Regions:
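PLP-dependent amino-acid enzyme catalytic core
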Residues: 1-90
Length: 90
C-alpha cells in the first residue's frame, strides 16, 4: 500500500478535532553533552498519553456506517486499546 502526501493531509484533517497539538521540545543539557540538537515530540501530552490516538482515530473515522454497526474491537491492553476506546467513545 502506497501512502501519498494527500493521504497524510486527509488523515490530519480527519483527526484534528479529536487530538491535541503536542509540542516539540529540546533539552539544552542533552544537546551540549552530545553535540547534537535533539528534539522531542511530546506525545505524552496527548489526550490518552500516547501517539496511538492518531492511528486509532484515523482508522475509526474511515469506517463506513455499515462497518461501525459491527462495533470496534482490538486485542491489546496498552496504548492501542486506549486509542480505540477513545475513538469509539467519540
Amino acid at each position: 500500500m502506497r501512502i501519498s502526501k494527500e493521504d497524510i493531509i486527509n488523515a490530519h484533517d480527519r483527526i484534528k478535532p479529536y487530538i491535541h497539538r503536542t509540542p516539540v521540545m529540546t533539552n539544552q543539557s542533552i544537546n551540549e553533552m552530545t553535540g547534537i540538537n535533539f528534539y522531542f515530540k511530546c506525545e505524552n501530552f496527548q489526550k490518552i498519553g500516547a501517539f496511538k490516538i492518531r492511528g486509532g482515530m484515523n482508522a475509526t473515522l474511515t469506517l463506513s456506517a455499515d462497518q461501525l454497526k459491527n462495533g470496534i474491537a482490538t486485542h491489546s491492553s496498552g496504548n492501542h486499546a486506549q486509542a480505540l476506546a477513545f475513538a469509539a467513545k467519540n
